[in-house]
Amino acid sequence: MVEPQEGKTRFHDFKLSNELMHAIHDLGFPYCTPIQAQVLGYTLRGQDAIGRAQTGTGKTAAFLISIISQLQQTPPPKERYMGEPRALIIAPTRELVVQIAKDAAALTKYTGLNVMSFVGGMDFDKQLKALEARHCDILVATPGRLLDFNQRGEVHLDMVEVMVLDEADRMLDMGFIPQVRQIIRQTPPKSERQTLLFSATFTDDVMNLAKQWTTNPAIVEIEPENVASETVEQHVYAVAGSDKYKLLYNLVTQNKWERVMVFANRKDEVRRIEEKLVRDGINAAQLSGDVPQHKRIRTLESFREGRITVLVATDVAGRGIHIDGISHVINFTLPEDPDDYVHRIGRTGRAGTSGVSISFAGEDDSYQLPAIEALLGRKIKCEMPPDELLKPVPRKHH
């Protein structure tokens, strides 16, 4: 039993089913994060909602708990075919879909609800077999792959009771909206389904889509600043470009860090850093658009399980990664878009734990700092790294 605590909402307060509470308890979530407390207050009553929240705020569990409650309370239709999901979650990237499906599997553990996911770059026939084997309650998919199945007549969306659009701003940026429209047209009219839309930003374009697809939605905004700055201790080291690798190597080895993410701006840079780390005896792996999907998923699993210490990634590849216990984020190069800085450092300090970010500012990228500080609304102290962190990397005897 979770004790009441002032200023905090317990999951217990929402009258969720025993099966769902059991799973939430297994995951070790005693209290709701702010977005969970606010969103669930509306969505559990069946209301539509638009949430502005970045990753790391707990929004995935918010919409999943809402979906599971809804599906548990309404019996499935009598006439039901394979390939007719009752809840549909659309997300822009493969990583995000895999992550949401994993969270959904954990939360539905005791409910008997089936979760399926479709992503491009994975074996089509294997996904099809899974679909034909049992009823699908919750379907998580990227827009393109969902349309493939839909156009082949394998998936029908006429039974969708709840629809979630995650990272709507990102879907806009990636040009997925025409596909999303095609998908939504095949679901029941908005008056007959519950629709939840999440976005890191509320631009006019996002709000227009929300207006078209939702009915009298509750609008929930969780300020992004505290995601970045309150739980993450931020440092900047002024360091010459040629010394950045030495600094990275020494930070990881001298501190014996166990789970670190390193961000760089370009794929070739990511590859180079990873190759050097591996050569110097560190368990490292890379994630970028060049890495085939099956390998990306294996890499993420190894990182989650601690077999990989350092994961080097580009912004696009790193954006959908939600792995608890990342102690440090290193910006090997400062990002060109200040928003990416917030997303990067948000990989650590997740769900209320503290984390550390260290940015390397060199002659090529330190000019990005003022824009990042403007977005954060404060200065980040720039320090010179201590000498022991710039020691030459010992050459391994091959």
Swiss-Prot record:
Q: Does the keyword Lipid biosynthesis apply?
A: no
> Pfam families annotated for this entry?
DEAD, Helicase_C
Would you identify the family this protein belongs to, as annotated?
A: Belongs to the DEAD box helicase family. RhlB subfamily.
Domain (Helicase C-terminal) spans 243-393
Subcellular location per UniProt equals:
Cytoplasm
Q: What is the role of this chain?
A: DEAD-box RNA helicase involved in RNA degradation. Has RNA-dependent ATPase activity and unwinds double-stranded RNA.
Entry's EC annotation:
3.6.4.13
Q: Name the encoding gene, please.
A: rhlB
Q: Where is this motif: DEAD box?
A: 166-169
> Can you name this protein?
ATP-dependent RNA helicase RhlB
A cellular component annotation (GO) from this entry: cytosol
Alphabetically sorted, this entry's keywords are:
ATP-binding, Cytoplasm, Helicase, Hydrolase, Nucleotide-binding, RNA-binding
Give the organism the record lists: Pseudomonas putida (strain ATCC 47054 / DSM 6125 / CFBP 8728 / NCIMB 11950 / KT2440)
HAMAP family found in the cross-reference section: DEAD_helicase_RhlB
Extent of motif Q motif: 9-37
Family matches, as SMART domains: DEXDc, HELICc
Q: How does it assemble?
A: Component of the RNA degradosome, which is a multiprotein complex involved in RNA processing and mRNA degradation.
Positions with a binding annotation for ATP:
A53, Q54, T55, G56, T57, G58, K59, T60
Q: Name one GO molecular function term.
A: ATP binding
Q: Which residues form the Helicase ATP-binding domain?
A: 40-220
Q: Which reaction does it catalyse?
A: ATP + H2O = ADP + phosphate + H(+)
